[in-house]
């Protein structure tokens, strides 16, 4: 089934609201094997909405509209769809009674314009709205399906899951499932080059995407049997792992910090961190993970040289000779936080996140990450690009990846 989404609302065109509905719907429809080829945003204008409907009606089997179901004069979606299809608007008594009950619950009386929301194109299947006053509806005409949904996500999402998803599932006999392989330490172009033959596969498909400092490969398989689909995905994942190897750090929703915490817990080891350029972001990422308290002993943000010297015990001579952003300082920060916290590992970050502070010798983006065990200290020099936020985020990923690699017995690059 070929589908598209028309999002109605001038506020979307003005950038006042982020269109999260289109993202949500596309993801859910993909699971049903429905291919979404077009997203359209249109303002609260009858003629322009009709133009969009005309285009969509000629190229798609399924058209979903979102927004424009409120009680005000600029809420025109149902009226415009009805006019486009040549259908009269008919009052639905159950919907009207539901609107009255909704207002009774909140101790208010509906105004006459609220009852506009109880009118639907003739023959439409009504979609109840348990979270608002704007029911949706489904219209089947000329072998096409038009689904009209409210704009607020708090209303659209429950309506879709309770009413629309089961309806569409009955109309399709194909399922799509995806798996996301997360890769760190290789750029997008390198990953694409390595897996290039797989990118031409038709089922399952493999698509590279860039995250914030990492790369993903999305495997998407389509079929009629869940077991068959899962086997296709697992076979493709195995092929990708054979090519990419240890640069793969997680699958689907799992994040780098979760991987590291699980490895520390599994090995009953502890970690402490001393941060400069990341300003507490590393500790935050770690403590975002439930159960981190079992393996995370201490986090120190030693932003100034005085803090590095007085709290962490970095030697004054080191700071004077090499500076705060140096191999030597990162080494001492990692060593000393490990000892201070009585932890198995110490992890440090020091660098120039910008936009100011760089010099020809030490430009913005220069970062050192230190990792201390009871036997050895590793220091990794990085030259990172991007704004201040990106440099900090990427530094944290590099730092956590060093710990991951060490715990898995993988060479630290």
From Swiss-Prot:
Identify the species of origin: Thermoanaerobacter pseudethanolicus (strain ATCC 33223 / 39E)
**SMART domains per record:** MoCF_biosynth
Please report which protein family the annotation says this sequence is part of.
Belongs to the CinA family.
Specify the protein name. Answer: Putative competence-damage inducible protein
Q: Which InterPro entries match?
A: CinA, CinA-like_C, CinA_C, CinA_KH, Competence-induced_CinA, MoaB/Mog-like_dom_sf, MoaB/Mog_dom
Q: What is one Pfam family matched by this protein?
A: MoCF_biosynth
